[in-house]
Amino acid sequence: KMMIDSVHKQNAHIMISIWASFGPQTQQYAKLKEKGLLFDFETWPQSGLSHIWPPRMDYPSGVKVYDAFSPVARQIYWDHLKKLFDYGMDAWWMDSTDPDFFNAKKEHYEQKGAMGSWRSVRNLFPLATVKGIYEKQRKASEEKRVFIMTRSAFAGQQHYGSGLWSGDVASTWDMLRKQVPAGLNYTMTGCPNFNTDIGGFFCGSYNTNGAGSAPRNKQYQELYVRWMQYGLFCPVFRSHGADAPREIYQFGKKGEPVYDAIEKTIRLRYRLLPYLYSTAWQVTSQGESYLRALHYDFASDRRTWDMADEFMFGRSILATPILNPQYTEEKIFREDAMSGWEKKELKDEKIKELNADFTEEKTVTKYLPKGADWFDFNTETLYRGGRDVTIPSALDRTAMFVKAGSILPLAPVMQYATEKQWDNLDIVIYPGCNATFLLYEDEGDNYNYERGAYSTIEMKWDNKKRTLTIDSRKGNFPGMMTNRRFNIRLAGTEDVKTVNYNGTAINVSM
C-alpha cells in the first residue's frame, strides 16, 4: 500500500500484471483444484526452474489455467485481487488471456468446464475472464472506472472496460508498420481500444554498448521516436518493453534532438486530451472508434480501400505516421518464430553504431484522401485532397493533418492529466466548410456519467458567415466549471479572440 500511495502522490496511476493461471503452491490453486475448476493442460510458465526457452521440464511448474466460465472460479479469482484493489490499485494488466496452451493433445480439448468442452469455449476465454474482473470491480465500487489491458479479446469485450495491446512485438520497422493495419482491423470488429508497446517489446539487439544501452543506439532512437509518434494516435499512449529502460532521460537530455522529440510528442498528447476525451464519449455513446480506417469516411476514394499506413484519429485528425527510417539504416530482422521468448531479438550485421545527424531536415510524401481539404497540423498549410503531398519530416515532427471543416480543442501544457482545469482551452477552427464539435466533460473518474452526471458544449462553425457559435451548456456534474475562457483562432492565422463563457450561448465572429 505504501508503494501504491507513493505513486499516487506523484500524480500517477499504477497497473499490475495478473494472469489467469496459478502455481500449485498458491492459495488460489488449492481452492480451485478442490472444486475442480482448473483446466489440465500446459501453460506459461512450463518450467518451475526458469523462463529460459526451451523450458527445463525436469521440474515442471504445474501451473494451471482457471475455469473463467465458472462463477465460483471467477469469485475465487477476484477474492485474491480485492485486497490489491482496496489498497488503491488502479488497473489490471491481464496477460495471457488467450491463454497460453502448449503441447496440445486431443484429451485437452475434450475436457469439460462450466460451459462445455475446452474445444467449444477456448476462443471465449478472454471475454469470460475480463468480464469477471469488470463485474466484480463494479460491484465493489462505483468510484473508480474499470481499466483492463489484455493480450487477447473476443467480440463484445469492449463492454467491460478493456483494451487490447498487440503483445510482445519485436523492435523493428517492419513490426511498427504492421501495427497500423493490426489496429485498424481489430477496431473494425467493434472493439475500439487498441494500443502497442511503444518502441516494441524486444529491443535487445540494439544493446550494442552493453545491457540496457538500446536508448543510446541511433537506430533504436529513431525507431522509438517514430513509434511514439504513431502511439500518439492510439487510445492508450504507453511505452513498455524488455531488454532496456524506456524513461525519457535514457535517450539523452533536454536540448538534444531525441529527448526533445520525445518530450514534444508527449506534450502534444496532453494538449489533445479534450479532443481525445470528447472522442471517447462518442465511442461510448455512439459506437464510434478512435482509429478509423480511411474507407469509413472516404469510401468513394478507391485509394483508401486498402490503405495500411494512414487512418483517421477520431473524426477530424488524419494520422500519417512515418513508418520508415530516414536517418539510419533499417534493421533487417529474421527469426525462427518458435525460437523462444528470450531469443526474439538476435544480433545481426545490420545493427551498427551510427553517427546519424537528427537535426537534418527531411521530407516525407503522404496521401490526402479525396473528399476533403486538409491542413498540415504543424505548418497549417492548406492542401486539396485526392493527391500526394510532400511535407517536412524532422525527427520531432509528428506527421498529421486536420480536415478542413473541423474544430479542435487543445488543453494547456500539462505534466499529468488533472494538473490543470480546462478553464482556458485553445479552440482552433480549420475553415473551408461548416464544422461542429461536441465538447464532453465529466468528473474524470467514477460511473456517475451513466446516471447523467456530465456536460456537453456544442460548437458550430458557419463557414459562410465566419462565425463560431458556442451553444448553451447542457447537463452538469459535481465540480463542473461554471465560468471559463476560450481562446479562438482560425488555422493559418495568428489572431486570437478570447471570450468568457458562463454556459450561455455566444456567437463569435472571426
Predicted regions and their residues:
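Catalytic-domain carbohydrate-binding cleft regions of carbohydrate-active enzymes
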Residues: 1-396
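Accessory, solvent-exposed terminal regions and/or long lumenal/extracellular loops of proteins
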Residues: 349, 395-504
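A surface-exposed beta-strand-loop module
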Residues: 509-510
